[in-house]
From Swiss-Prot:
Organism for this UniProt entry: Methanocaldococcus jannaschii (strain ATCC 43067 / DSM 2661 / JAL-1 / JCM 10045 / NBRC 100440) (Methanococcus jannaschii)
A Pfam family: DUF5915
Reaction equations catalysed: tRNA(Ile) + L-isoleucine + ATP = L-isoleucyl-tRNA(Ile) + AMP + diphosphate
Gene label: ileS
Major enzyme class: ligase
Record protein name field: Isoleucine--tRNA ligase
């Protein structure tokens, strides 16, 4: 053991990291456990698209804390780090670097090959940056063997997975309405869009469609996407709803509008804002099914010639039926464009309507009046056109939730395109059953996950992009047949232009795009141009990360709540397809990090907290502890800088306790030896019991994991059990003679407790714990704290002792509160206290009377009732009056004759009969009346009564403590060592009878003549109002 100095936790981080690196500690820990039971962890991969943020820091700290615990429990932890390196997150960043404004410029400005190379460079560069940041947080993972989806081996397993899906009939190419990003020019999957809805303002337009065969009669529709009216092919009504023919008089004309009956008033009120409506009335009512087949004239027929062709079709421009129609706003008649809405698409197929989507990849019209115009830019002109045609009922704005691209944040479009899908709908029931086998933390995530699966559609896995795993599908240009290639070996066997392509070392575009295969029909097969959804990449992780084609269930995974419908789902979906099972056993969902006001952190708001800045100021361990203790990890975390100061205070308290203990041990050349355990006092046995109880709680809660209970338990032990209680109890014992058994027992207790505390603390605060361990360990101990197990010495746990001490601490706390109330500081002794309570309290007080006296500074303790006190009965006249009315005086007379204390005890059991009257507890208030010089303070199991009388002797003793405190403060100012002796001289107060005590407490010697190195004047005020002006002089003996 070496003397401990005050700590800078950031510098401590660096020192311990250096120790770990120089001694290869991580590898030695893995080596120690390599033959033990395996624990398989799959790292949810962060995107290599920039520096880490507080959320990713929290995520890795959760993982690292749990895995450190598992290693310490002896498991052979498989802990590969993982990275997400494909997809739009990287592409968008690289586009920004090159000033690329749209997808076409990738090919025209720099070319696909260079773009792919730059994406790879970007991903690898930021992988290194982020890895360094994670290491800065103290995160131990297998960084050297991290899994990267850009490797040939990983991508090949992706191909194999898709081929299995194909062989099982779960892969299909189909024309469907999908989410489409016009900026990235690609389709997106449903799960990518969940959580990406934002509140926006869009047009709110009510439009009339004139019926073809009924004069002056119109159906009224409502839409927030006027641009889709260009592609309208039908109007849908609910077959069972009531619809009204409404005769409307307005603007000097009369028309009939067809509107759902329940929405007539709402629609007319909207119309009044645009038209001078004089009168309206319902002239006819029909069911929705009676409207089926009614033809209307398309409102933009002249603006889009294609609509004239559609008008010739049987079901186009007609009213059709659909169960999806609601009466929650709008008109009850739904504008239907099968090429631009999922429900529109389904109902359109039912009526054999064309799947018409007249827009290109950039979201621009490809025909008609607005050809070449971005659809959203056409909204205003379309509305104006409708107005000019007399078809506009109302136009305004509406604030609603609308999906955006998860990477570039552009509002998405709904667009019918041909895409590749995994038909999850066919195995959805299996997926739901699998989910029920997982241990979800918190448990309600299971319901959230299953509900998400119930509503999820087939997985659109194709992306019209570049940087990703190419879809391994080759299509024959002659017959249209396609094959799915499952490996490089298979590809090399079937390729017909090997000489042109050469050896296949990279599976990215454009390399694989050059490869041609021969079809059975003799035609040439080319690869489809799409790449796989990046969530397909991460979904492969449970088996592709370790390079196997078999199910290996992860023992533990954890990610933020946005991943419930993303990564938790994507890896499950793929494993369900390939292995018919779920790839993880335990899944913890954590929250998001927010600013102190609960707002999302963003650069534009200027509220981003950089984890590197926090670590630089406080050290990694303090950030780690804060993030795991601020609240339950599944709740969103509000980061508050001032709360980091609270954690700093906690760790300083821990370090000060450690420094206090070790520096006294070093001073006395203490050598730990279990033989000193035979000299333990009750307070020593108590703290030993407590640290083992804490270890037990820690193990139980880390196993779940419930990090909040684990960290809160540690905090309570450090602050309340160790620092504020045990060290206070044994402080005087450290000043005894060097070989005193009582002192050595205290040292051995502190040594044992600090060593075990460091072990318990190690998962969350690895640097601090390692530093403490390295100074406490003996030659026969393990090289690192992480080669030790968190263990519980059950034989040392004494629950009765812990209960007794808890009562005593409550009593002492009550004394402190009483002192505050009567303004009588702890330095002045109390003449006497009386403690009232049950047998449990009496036993604890008798056992630890010496502690109560010492810690409460009390001269005498009694148990029971206070002399001169009495219980009195106060009738509750309001309650008595309700029951007994005119007989209340007789009831009060009966109460006055009763024994108050006896009545109080009887009322605890329920109602009591006095002189024939029923007395309920609410009829009376029974309270204890105590003498004026007694102050009563309640605690959890009783009351402490403090005798507040002050005597001269009590004041003198208090003054002695006042002087000791001031001499100690002056020693601190002088920066004296603990053992350094001093000469002292005190003027202005007579303390001759306490000289020996003062000399012992301050390691000093009173002298008459002094050459002061430091002197100071003090004013001391006593509780009885007296003032003393005291001069204290100190001279160092060893100068």
């Amino acid at each position: 053991m070496k003397k401990v100095e005050p700590v800078n936790f950031r510098e401590l981080d660096k020192k311990i990291k250096k120790f770990w690196e120089e001694n290869d500690i991580y590898q030695k820990v893995k080596k120690k456990n390599e033959r033990n039971k395996e624990f398989y962890f799959v790292d949810g991969p962060p995107y290599c698209s920039g520096a880490i943020h507080l959320g990713t820091a929290w995520n890795k700290i959760i993982k690292d804390t749990y895995l450190r615990f598992k290693r310490m429990q002896g498991y052979n932890v498989l802990d590969k780090a993982g990275w997400d390196m494909h997809g739009l997150p990287i592409e968008v960043k690289v586009e920004n670097e090159f000033g690329i404004k749209n997808k076409k410029e990738i090919e025209t400005k720099i070319g696909v090959k260079q773009f792919i190379e730059k994406c790879k460079e970007f991903a690898l560069k930021h992988k290194e940056i982020m890895e360094k940041q994670f290491k800065n947080l103290g995160v131990w993972l297998d960084w050297e063997n991290a899994y990267m989806p850009i490797t040939k081996e990983y991508m090949e397993i992706g191909w194999w997975t898709l081929k299995v899906a194909h062989e099982k009939g779960l892969l299909t190419r189909d024309l469907r309405v999908v989410y489409w990003c016009p900026r990235c020019e690609t389709a997106l999957a449903e799960h990518e869009v969940r959580g990406e809805y934002k509140e926006v303002y869009d047009p709110s337009v009510y439009v009339k469609f004139r019926l073809a065969n009924e004069e002056n009669t119109y159906i009224v529709i409502w839409t927030t996407t006027p641009w889709t009216l260009v592609a309208n092919l039908a109007v849908t009504v609910h077959p069972d709803y009531d619809y009204a023919y409404v005769e409307v008089e307005f603007d000097d004309k009369k028309e009939v509008w067809i509107i759902a009956e329940k929405l007539v008033e709402e629609v007319i009120n909207k119309a009044k804002k645009f038209h001078n409506i004089k009168n309206y009335k319902i002239i006819k009512k029909v069911k929705g099914k009676e409207l089926e087949g009614i033809k209307y004239i398309h409102p933009l027929l002249e603006e889009n010639e294609r609509q004239k062709e559609f008008a010739e079709l049987e079901n186009a421009h007609t009213v059709i039926l659909g169960e999806h129609v609601t009466l929650e706003g709008g008109t009850g008649l739904v504008h239907t464009a099968p090429g631009h809405g999922e429900e529109d698409f389904e109902v359109g197929k039912k009526y054999n309507l064309p799947i018409y989507s007249p827009i290109d990849d950039e979201g621009k019209y490809v025909e008609g009046k607005w050809k070449g115009v971005f659809v959203k830019d056409a909204d205003a002109e379309i509305i104006e056109t409708l107005k000019n045609k007399g078809l506009l009922v109302y136009a305004g704005k509406i604030k609603h939730s609308y999906p955006h691209c998860w990477r570039c944040k552009t509002p998405l479009l709904f667009r019918a395109t041909e895409q590749w899908f995994l038909e999850i709908s066919k195995i959805k029931d299996n997926i739901i059953e699998h989910a029920k086998t997982v241990q979800w933390i918190p448990h309600w995530v299971e319901t959230r996950y299953i509900n998400g699966v119930k509503f999820v559609g087939d997985w659109n896995i194709s992306r019209q992009r570049y940087w990703g795993i190419p879809i391994p599908v080759w299509v024959c240009e002659k017959c249209g047949k396609y094959i799915v290639v499952g490996s490089v070996e298979e590809l090399e066997e079937k390729m017909i232009n090997k000489d042109e392509v050469g050896e296949i070392n990279d599976l990215h575009k454009p390399t694989v795009d050059k490869i041609k295969l021969r079809c059975e029909c003799g035609g040439e097969m080319k690869r489809v141009p799409d790449v796989l959804d990046v969530w397909f990449d991460s979904g492969l992780a449970p088996y592709a990360s370790i390079g196997v084609k078999e199910l290996k269930k992860a023992d533990f995974i954890t990610e933020g709540h946005d991943q419930v419908t993303k990564w938790f789902y994507s890896q499950h979906a793929l494993s369900a397809i390939v292995f018919n099972d779920i790839p993880y056993k335990k899944c913890l969902m954590h929250g998001f990090t927010l600013d102190e006001h609960g707002d999302k952190m963003s650069k534009s708001l200027g509220n981003v907290v950089n984890p590197d800045d926090v670590v630089e100021k406080y050290g990694a361990d303090l950030l780690r502890f804060y993030l795991l203790s601020a609240n339950k990890v599944w709740e969103d975390l509000r980061f508050v800088w001032s709360e980091m100061d609270d954690v700093l205070s906690l760790f300083n308290t821990l370090w000060n306790a450690y420094m206090f203990a070790v520096n006294y041990m070093v001073l006395d050349n203490f050598k730990p030896d279990e033989k000193y355990f035979e000299y333990l006092k009750d307070e020593d046995r108590w703290i030993v019991s407590r640290i083992n109880s804490v270890a037990k709680i820690a193990i139980e809660n880390l196993e779940v994991p419930y990090f909040h209970t684990y960290t809160w338990t540690l905090k309570d032990f450090i602050l309340n059990d160790l620092s504020r209680w045990y060290i206070r109890l044994i402080r005087d014992r450290t000043w005894k003679e060097k070989d005193d058994a009582d002192k050595l027992a205290a040292y051995q207790t502190l040594y044992y407790v600090l060593l075990k505390l460091a072990t318990i603390l190690a998962p969350v605060a690895p640097h601090t714990a390692e530093a403490i361990y390295q100074n406490l360990k003996t030659e026969d101990m393990e090289e690192s704290i992480f080669m030790n197990k968190i263990e519980v010495d059950e034989e040392f746990i004494d629950e009765e002792l812990e209960r007794d001490m808890a009562i005593v601490r409550d009593v002492v706390d009550a004394i402190y509160r009483g002192r505050d109330r009567i303004k009588y500081t702890l330095r002045y002794p109390l003449k006497e206290i009386t403690i009232a309570g049950g047998e449990e309290v009496k036993k604890a007080v008798e056992r630890f009377e010496y502690i109560i006296k010492e810690q409460g500074n009390v001269k005498n303790i009694k148990f029971g009732e206070v002399e001169g006190s009495k219980y009195i009965i106060k009738p509750n006249y309001r309650e008595l009056g309700k029951r007994y009315r005119s007989e209340v005086p007789k009831v009060v007379e009966a109460l006055n004759k009763a024994d108050a204390k006896e009545l109080m005890e009887r009322l605890k059991e329920g109602a009591v009969i006095l002189d024939g009257y029923e007395i309920k507890p609410e009829y009376v208030e029974i309270r204890l009346e105590i003498p004026e010089h007694i102050a009563g303070v309640e605690f959890s199991k009783g009351t402490v009564f403090i005798n507040t009388e002050i005597t001269d002797d009590l004041i003198k003793e208090g003054l002695m403590r006042e002087v000791i405190r001031r001499i100690q403060a002056m020693r601190k100012d002088m920066d004296l060592d603990i053992e350094e002796k001093i000469k002292i001289k005190v003027e202005g107060i007579d303390l001759d009878e306490f000289k020996e005590i003062i000399e012992r407490e301050v390691r000093g010697q009173f002298v008459d003549e002094i050459k002061a190195d430091y002197e100071k004047d003090w004013e001391i005020k006593t509780p009885n109002g007296e003032k003393y002006n005291v001069k204290i002089a100190i001279e160092r003996i060893n100068k």
